Amino acid sequence: SPNIVLILSDDQAWTDYGFMGHEDIETPNLDRLASRSRVFRRGYVASPLCRPSLASMVTGLFPFDHGVTGNDVDGRNNREKLDIPVQEQFHQHPSFIKDLVKNGYLAHQSGKWWEGSHFDGGFTHGMKLNGRHGSGESLSIGRKGIESIKSFVDLSLNDEKPFFIWYAPFLPHTPYNPPERLLEKYRKPG
């Protein structure tokens, strides 16, 4: 079984990569990975919002079928409490992640994940236990390193099991705080 790494960037156009033909943006590591991977060049979203789109990708259902139709539930207070029935309904649906695990994969969640704990989502390992977009370590993935992913890959190799990695860094979402070396590279004179 092949290992699978799903990379989901936040608020980034499909054209913003070297391997997709951007003339200015350089993405050498992603270009190298793309050259030996399957790249989906014609992807479409089920919703213009993050959360329902991710839920549709996981379940294969439209938002009105899986019940996640917005990023936030209505209500000024107690949003987390009001969101519990939405998450419970979501977890009743099929999921490609649960299918991978049933077929012997180890599955790791890192970065953005809206639907409760990674265990609820069918992942065997993960970073996020709660929160709207993730919290702490989950949102710092990519900005501060990928140690949890490296450890997970080592574990999978030691266990001789195929792996699935959900790598959904909050990048390039705000705050825009690139390393100075990259900022200088793209800064225009004057």
Please report, for each region that a protein language model flagged, where it lies by residue.
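Formylglycine-dependent sulfatase
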Residues: 1-190
